[in-house]
């Protein structure tokens, strides 16, 4: 193993309109087939629809949604002595944000609606109100971790 310094954590550049790193992380996760301008259009459309529907700052709603969806613990399958255990593990802040973004996007993709921008907007509003598919996913993960708390020493 190298004795050099540990590699620096990659940071994303803030987006041009809101000047926020969280939004650029979201854009990079929305991205499909290298079409970044389309990803920007989808996210900015979602932000404008949240502003229109709630009358509040969409960045504030996004932050609230991220707080409500970000998990504290996850379960990871670990094979010990021929049987597989679901071992609960704590999640770091960056990994938690990445999971929250992924869950928000998968929930909004599965949602019925006209276009991705409106579906993402409604999912953000629901998550900020503490309901919605992404929040349910976080609660299921926490329940699973609580149920398998006995295996926490297998880390």
Curated annotation (Swiss-Prot):
Pfam families the UniProt entry points to: Ribosomal_S7 (PF00177)
InterPro entries named among the record's database cross-references: Ribosomal_uS7 (IPR000235), Ribosomal_uS7_bac/org-type (IPR005717), Ribosomal_uS7_CS (IPR020606), Ribosomal_uS7_dom (IPR023798), Ribosomal_uS7_dom_sf (IPR036823)
Signal peptide: none
GO cellular component terms given for this protein: plastid; small ribosomal subunit
Chief site of localization: plastid
Localization in the cell: Plastid
CDD domains found in the cross-reference section: uS7_Chloroplast
GO BP terms in the entry: translation
Assembly: Part of the 30S ribosomal subunit.
Function: One of the primary rRNA binding proteins, it binds directly to 16S rRNA where it nucleates assembly of the head domain of the 30S subunit.
Annotated family: Belongs to the universal ribosomal protein uS7 family.
Protein name: Small ribosomal subunit protein uS7c
